[in-house]
Amino acid sequence: HPRSSAASDVYKRQGLGGSGIGGKIATQIVADQLKIPAVINNDYTMPKFINENTLVIVSSFSGNTEETLEALKVAQKANSEIACITHGGKLAEIAKENDYNLLILPKAFSPRAMLTYSVIQQLYLFNHYGFVNNDYVEQTKATVALLDKEVEDIISTAKQTARALQNKTFVTYSESSMEGVIVRFKQQINENSKALGWAHVFPEMNHNELVGWAGGKEEYAVIIFRSSYEHPRSSVRIDICKDIFKKHTSTVLEFNAKGDSFLAQTFYHILLGDWISVYLAELYKVDDVEVEVINFLKAELAKI
């Protein structure tokens, strides 16, 4: 459908888990172009400010995510401009019934395996609604070529990193513009490797979490994802804090992204992080696909 003239004030993105992180990453890729507020929503509810001038992109791989479908009702009641990204399920049915813009994801084992589709489709929607240009098209092609060239080195680095993370609690950091990358990395370690850890960003962590490093231990492994797009002062902060971390743990790893665009550097880190999680799963001898505890939770919720 053509762009609605109503969708001009706020961009609102609804989704959770593997279907939700794509919104965060896509928004950060085009942050330098967006001239409207962009809000990522991961809940049952929607902010009170949404109205007929709000574009709401609703994403759920299965199309049956409970929280997303509940939030969609709020957007419908507000008469917002709605676009949907899904493989099927109830979300696809609702989109077709209401003639919403609908992008269909191909079948896959899990939502987290569809991240690239999710990000690119959202960039397409940003462009379709007139919020960004189409530079992402050529940047995506260049990124594919880059990753094809670098994949063997990325895999080698991932194997070494997985060994360094084994039997440790991981802590991952980046500058705020790369927050989507480290949240994705944390999620992949959680789901694929069945391990716990946390993620935080510079400069915010300097105002709270840094003090917590007084209780840092050797059992912590720090992974820092760097980008040439960092704010210069954040880069200085990271360099100083590396030395602070090293006073408490010998495992402080730093990765510099390759690529000529923010999009390329983003996916370089995502690919590296994904491979780390897979090889860590191998070391832990766990199934990197299995998420039975999530299925159990959904089954229990369905009883209530």
Give the positions of each predicted feature.
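Single conserved hydrophobic/aromatic residue that forms the stacking wall/gate
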Residues: 1-7, 11
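Active-site phosphate/pyrophosphate-binding segments
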Residues: 6-8, 127-221, 299-304
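C-terminal active-site/capping subdomain that shapes the small-molecule cofactor and substrate pocket
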Residues: 211-292
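Short, glycine-/Ser/Thr-/acidic-enriched flexible segments
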Residues: 18, 177-178, 204, 227-230, ...
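Short, small/acidic-rich helices and loops at N termini and domain boundaries
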Residues: 287-304
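A generic structural motif
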Residues: 40-43, 195-206, 251-260
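Predominant activation on well-ordered alpha-helical scaffold segments within soluble catalytic domains
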Residues: 27-28, 69, 119-126, 183-190, ...
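Glycine-rich phosphate-binding loops that contact phosphosugars or nucleotide phosphates
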Residues: 9-148, 227-232, 236-251
